[in-house]
Structures are given as C-alpha cells and as structure tokens.
Amino acid sequence: MPEIRVTPLGAGQDVGRSCILVSIAGKNVMLDCGMHMGFNDDRRFPDFSYITQNGRLTDFLDCVIISHFHLDHCGALPYFSEMVGYDGPIYMTHPTQAICPILLEDYRKIAVDKKGEANFFTSQMIKDCMKKVVAVHLHQTVQVDDELEIKAYYAGHVLGAAMFQIKVGSESVVYTGDYNMTPDRHLGAAWIDKCRPNLLITESTYATTIRDSKRCRERDFLKKVHETVERGGKVLIPVFALGRAQELCILLETFWERMNLKVPIYFSTGLTEKANHYYKLFIPWTNQKIRKTFVQRNMFEFKHIKAFDRAFADNPGPMVVFATPGMLHAGQSLQIFRKWAGNEKNMVIMPGYCVQGTVGHKILSGQRKLEMEGRQVLEVKMQVEYMSFSAHADAKGIMQLVGQAEPESVLLVHGEAKKMEFLKQKIEQELRVNCYMPANGETVTLPTSPSIPVGISLGLLKREMAQGLLPEAKKPRLLHGTLIMKDSNFRLVSSEQALKELGLAEHQLRFTCRVHLHDTRKEQETALRVYSHLKSVLKDHCVQHLPDGSVTVESVLLQAAAPSEDPGTKVLLVSWTYQDEELGSFLTSLLKKGLPQAPS
C-alpha cells in the first residue's frame, strides 16, 4: 500500500527551526531548514540525524525546498549543506534567493564576529550553499526528476514567500510555509487552487486567534506611538529587515505626512536601501495598489524615515526607531532596548511573534527583571506593548486555506501544542478532515489510495455541459466515453473522437434476447399485435411498424419468428445497442408478461 511519511525535525509542536522531512512515493524531500532564535548551542539547528543513519544525505534526499527568507526557515541552510554535507538541489523563489544570503550574513556577523560563537558557518559557506540554489517562478511546474515535480504558490507573508506543492504521480503534498490570508499595505493575500492534495502541511502560529479589524489595530498603533513621542519618550519597534518593517514604515510615513510631525523616525542602517532595492526588483510580488502606483511614486522611498546611526540612541528628545532583529535576541534592537529600558517615558512595541527563550518573549510574558550576558540584571521600566502586525494566518485564515485546497488530511506544524490541539479539533469537527500534530522526531504515516489521473477531452465536457450534466465536486457522477492511453497518459474522449484518433471504423454492437410468445398466428400478425400493445403502453417513445414487419422502439428492434421445433409458438427477438440497455431490458420484461388477449 503506498504511503506518505512526515517527520518534523523542527517546528513540531514548536515555533522555530522549521524543518520537515516528507517521503512520498519513494521520494524524500526536506521542507525548510531553519534556525531556532531562542538557543545559542546545538539546539538552534534541527536534528538532521533523523534523515538517515547510513550514507550521504545527498544520496537520500531528492531535494530541499525553502519557503521564504526568514531565518527560522532558512537559517540552518549553510550549516546543513556545507558542514553536515548536502550537494543536491535547493529550491526557492527568486526574491528568497536574493535576500536569503544577506540575512544569513547579517546573522553570522552577530553570532560569530560579535558574540564569538564556535561551530558556525562562514561567509564562504553561505556563498557555496547559494550556488546549489535553483530559483523558481510562481505557478511554474518544475521537474526535479522524471517522477518528482514541484510548484510554487503565492503565500503573502513576506516578499517572495511561497507555498509548495510536491507531486509524485497521483500523490501530492502541499507545504504552506508561513502565509497570510489577508492582503496588507504592500503584499497580496495567499492563494492556492483547489488542488486536493493527499496532505496539507500548514503553519499554526495563531491557531487560536481571530484577529480584530486591521484598521483598529493600525489606529491603536499610531495612537500609542504619537502619545509616547508627544510626552518626550522614545519608541523602539523591533522588526525583521523585510516584511512587517515595510508595512509599518508605510503606515507611519503616511501618518507623519498627514499630521505634519517633525519627530525623527529612523531605520537600521543599510537595510532600508537594501529593502528598497529588492522591492523595486521584485515589484510583481507586491500588491495591486503598489504595482499600479510604482511608476509615479515608489512607496518605499520614505521622506520622513532616515537611516539610523548608533550614536542617535543617546540623543535627547523623542524619536521612533525601527531596529533589527524582531525578537530582541541580538543585534541593534537589543542594544537600543538595553539603553532605553530604564526610562518609563519610553515604549517598546513588539509587532510580531517571539519564540521562547528570546528577550522579546520574556518581556511579553511580563518579566521586568532580565538576566543579560555576564549575569547583569536589566530592570525594564519602559512600557511594553504587543500589537499583532504579524503576517501569519489566524485561525480563520487557516480554516479558509484548508477549505480552499480541499486536502484529504491536514498536518499542523509551526505552533504551540495547546493551541494546535484546539485547531486540530476544529478542523476535524467542522471540515471533517483528519488532522495530525506530530512533535519533533515523531513520524506520521498516511496510507494513500492508488489512483490514475485521467484527462477529459474538451468535446466530451462540452457535450456533458450542454446536457446540463456538469459533475459536481461533492456529488461525483459517471461520464461515458472511450478511454485512450498514449505515452502512459490516460484520456477520456467521445467514441467519435476515439475512432478518428485511432483510425478505426465504427462497428455497432447489439444485444439480442429471445422472448417466447404463445401465438399461433402468422409472424406478421404477431408483430402487428406487439406494435399495437407497445404503442398503447409507451406513449413517450417513438414506436414504429416497419414495412418488413419488424417493430422499433427508439433503437430497439423487435422481430417475430416461428421456431422450427414448435410452429404453434412464436419467438420475439428483441435487440438493442448498449446505449439503450435500460429500454431493452424494460421491453424484454414487459413482453415476457405476454400480449393482451386479442378480441375474438
């Protein structure tokens, strides 16, 4: 029995180091290769020993797919390919290919050059890793080999994020990565067709959350920022370089312009320029409004937002600073936080999810005394606000995507166990779909029913539609046609088209049944009695008496004959084509009951 096996190496009942191993019809695919921001030891990387105990990883894995450039999805890639050892293809979209190495190098500098961490990848390893990348376009079907194919769908979330369909023959798995089902100020909503995979592997970060109105959240965010700078405080907004950063920059830029505010807004040095460059380069990945107005005005060229210099953090007076990274686990955002945390006038606004172990997660959990490096205790007096501008789907969005794709089963990753359990029950009860939520290292095995895909000719479909017999997804029905196999592909076509394509002449096949009648009259008289009887019974059918004495009802032919062994009885031969099988069977049953008594 064919089966699909799924083992999370990371992000199983957890958020961070996303890495899922999928085996489908003898092919092995690794989905994402992320890093956990809450750890500084070997636990930051997925446990690759689950992949295979014997031989090279390249011999076992057919390919690696990266959904987007966030480090919890791609951060372990150079470690995996260059230090663990993998030489096979790595698939990702063009924007991910462009941005991924920049973020990897930024993080490497923080981890190695500033913190002095060992057993970490080098700049050269990042370059060597990226040489193995094969970039894909949206909706492009890519043949990994003769049997395995992949296809990318738009995921929203961040520039270049994609959901991937992995297909081998008639079996398929869809992996969502991170996605957003609602459009925002710079990206569109995630979209996938009704692909009906055997399994949908979906993120579940906000498995129990139904978000409030986006407009209310934006108004609340602007109000809090404005109130803080009005009283002379500083606002720190930790963000990742691309994604929510651009969303909130557009929002503040518009507000500052409208209110004619002069308080400075800063963004981490260098990242605005890089972001601007990539949004220009990959403008087709943005939403419709930005694509339309891009020629007249680039929404990412900000008038009020300037590059940040480290010395600005000590400047007196109010300011707003966007600093990376978004979870306060390292880098410039953490440095600024340490400087500003002791002043109650200041505010830190966390606009996205923070994994356990990060400073961001600790302050959102209510901790106000933090043990930093060197056992130094930092007292947090500044105001802490969490405002979800996260580009992840909420519970409603996840249910919407499951309904859209119509999978046979669902598997939840990238979420917290308790929240996953709630969503699992919701999916099973409301959508009647089996749902799984394996922990890291746990394997889920799903049996699949072998099926053969059959293409249907346009002519046959048009004929069915003209008869008002279009099949429905929920109520399947039979289509009659001729099955043709060519180059291992099956097609259902009309019999006329099949004869034409195969160069064959039509031969009519008829079925004949003998019905015995007790009648001593001549054959012609018997046939006339049969005609009169059927004419009176079958008022909605075309019943004819032909010159040769035979009777027809539609395509059914009836002929009376005297059997040689008993001239006193007659045999009625009833013959029909397979199209009129129901009518032929009905007439046979009717005539077996006998003819009405003739008047004397």
Curated annotation (Swiss-Prot):
GO cellular component terms, A-Z: blood microparticle; cytoplasm; cytosol; INTAC complex; integrator complex; nucleoplasm; nucleus
Gene Ontology MF term list: RNA endonuclease activity
Impact when changing K462R: Abolished sumoylation, leading to impaired integrator complex integrity
Outcome following mutation: V551E: In NEDMLOB; uncertain significance
GO terms under biological process: regulation of transcription elongation by RNA polymerase II; RNA polymerase II transcription initiation surveillance; snRNA 3'-end processing; snRNA processing
Enzyme class: hydrolase
Residues noted as binding 1D-myo-inositol hexakisphosphate in the record, renumbered to the chain: K462
Active site (UniProt): E203
Subcellular location: Nucleus; Cytoplasm
Protein EC: 3.1.27.-
Residue ranges of the motif Nuclear localization signal: 469-479
Impact when changing E203Q: Abolished RNA endonuclease activity. Abolishes the ability of the Integrator complex to process U1 and U2 snRNA genes. Does not affect interaction with INTS9
Impact upon substituting G55S: In NEDMLOB; uncertain significance; may affect function; the orthologous mutation in Ints11-deficient Drosophila is unable to rescue locomotor defects
Statement: the UniProt record of this protein carries the keyword Transcription: no
Protein family per UniProt: Belongs to the metallo-beta-lactamase superfamily. RNA-metabolizing metallo-beta-lactamase-like family. INTS11 subfamily.
Subunit: Component of the Integrator complex, composed of core subunits INTS1, INTS2, INTS3, INTS4, INTS5, INTS6, INTS7, INTS8, INTS9/RC74, INTS10, INTS11/CPSF3L, INTS12, INTS13, INTS14 and INTS15. The core complex associates with protein phosphatase 2A subunits PPP2CA and PPP2R1A, to form the Integrator-PP2A (INTAC) complex. INTS11 is part of the RNA endonuclease subcomplex, composed of INTS4, INTS9, INTS11 and inositol hexakisphosphate (InsP6). Interacts with WDR73; interaction is required for the assembly of the RNA endonuclease subcomplex in the cytoplasm.
Disease: Neurodevelopmental disorder with motor and language delay, ocular defects, and brain abnormalities: An autosomal recessive disorder apparent from infancy or early childhood, and characterized by global developmental delay, intellectual disability, motor and speech impairment, and brain abnormalities. Specifically, brain imaging shows progressive cortical atrophy, cortical gyral simplification, and delayed myelination affecting cerebrum and cerebellum. Ocular defects can include optic atrophy, nystagmus, strabismus, and retinal dystrophy.
Protein name according to UniProt: Integrator complex subunit 11
UniProt organism field: Homo sapiens (Human)
Taxonomy of the source species: Eukaryota, Metazoa, Chordata, Craniata, Vertebrata
